[in-house]
Amino acid sequence: MKNGFLAAVLLTLGTLAFGARAGAGPQNYQGPEPEWTPSMVKPCDRACLVGFMDGYMNAIFQHDPNAVPPLARDVRMTENTAELNIGEGMLWRSKVEPTSFKIVIADPVFGQVAEQTRLKIGGQDALVAIRLKIDRNRIEEIEQIWTRGVDKTAIPLLTTPRPGLVDDVPASERTSRDVLIWAANSYFDALEGDDGKIGAFADDCVRHENGYQTVNNPPPGGRMMPSPMLPNASTPQGQEQLKISMMTCSAQISTKILNFIKKIRPRRVLVVDEQKGVVATFPFFVEDGTRRGGDPNAPPGMMLNLYTMETFGIRGGLIHEVEAFPFVTIPYGLNNGWTEGAGH
């Protein structure tokens, strides 16, 4: 995860500079917002929510803001934390093409749907997360996160989503909404507490970060961080990294290798899909920029925050899959574009 902080900073700064909010731009409002009455309450089930997401993504692929499904008058959109109008930003202004990797999480209870996907942006592989909030059958919120520079070594795990993140859970085996939310929050509790026993982890839990498996790797080990380079087994440091890469989700966190994280606020456990047993979160990792490393002469840590989407496959109250991407770094003190006061 730490390498994700370093690798994403230039991409983030480029996005923040891509364009500020300017002009109204094309907006598919479909008339003035009517006065609300109880008769306007229409259910939007899972298929309805997925339809909104598919319609939105197709509009992006077509470069046609007018093809976006109906929008609320006060619709709000951000891209990598910057507030923009529909039709602005990298996803709208670049050539964007779909790939075979797509995870869709839909929550009819709170009217939210999220997609975690690999796209082609300008011919380059990119990792993208999008969240829509639907109210009265209109899109009220749009949140977009993306990063490019995906190395070819990450593509094998970004070709087909794991079944535990896309398959339906049999109705008789589904986990309650409350337990799904609790399990997702326990992951962040474990990270903040540097204690894997706090988390509701299954023994076979596997975490993927930016397309790399960083835990529970089979012998002789693999990556313990999302980096194209494998640890060098001929060095003591590489041997230790290989050892950590083979640990379970719980045991790895307990080594305190992630103690550079000061806090995770807000966590934003936003989309709970009981049908799939999957929870989508949009956490904000605040790094401790005052902590020094082992060398007393080393400079303080980098003052960066990390913004991402983390998706959890949860069955029987335990986390079996973690899919984390894209990693976008934000200068310390800036927030996620949705939560006032975040970033410190």
Regions found by a protein language model. Give the residues of each.
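Positively charged n-region of N-terminal signal peptides that target proteins for export
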Residues: M1-G4
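Bacterial N-terminal signal peptides
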Residues: A7-A17
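C-terminal and inter-domain tail/linker signature
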Residues: R21-H344
